[in-house]
Amino acid sequence: MQACMVPGLALCLLLGPLAGAKPVQEEGDPYAELPAMPYWPFSTSDFWNYVQHFQALGAYPQIEDMARTFFAHFPLGSTLGFHVPYQED
């Protein structure tokens, strides 16, 4: 059994570079730059009304996305992966 696997592995290693295989993604890393801060144009009470509505529907992934957008506007936004500009108090 091993006698068949060794030549097969050697053949794959030798023919691999000749196949010209390239990685699918040639550009830079899309996650290298932090995403822009999302915009939440509504009030806080609107946010909680949406949370209650999505809870009634059982749409928990949508609640997570909406919460990330809402809380990105507070100082803890940098912990969510967004670049928050420096704000003086």
From Swiss-Prot:
It holds the Pfam family OTOS. It is found in: Secreted. GO terms for cellular component: extracellular region. Disulfide bonds: none annotated. Residues 1-21 form the signal peptide. GO terms for biological process: sensory perception of sound. The keyword Cell inner membrane does not apply. Its main location: secreted. InterPro entries: Otospiralin. It comes from the Eukaryota. Ear specific. The keyword Iron does not apply. Keywords: Secreted, Signal. May be essential for the survival of the neurosensory epithelium of the inner ear. Belongs to the otospiralin family. This is Otospiralin. It comes from Homo sapiens (Human). The gene is OTOS.
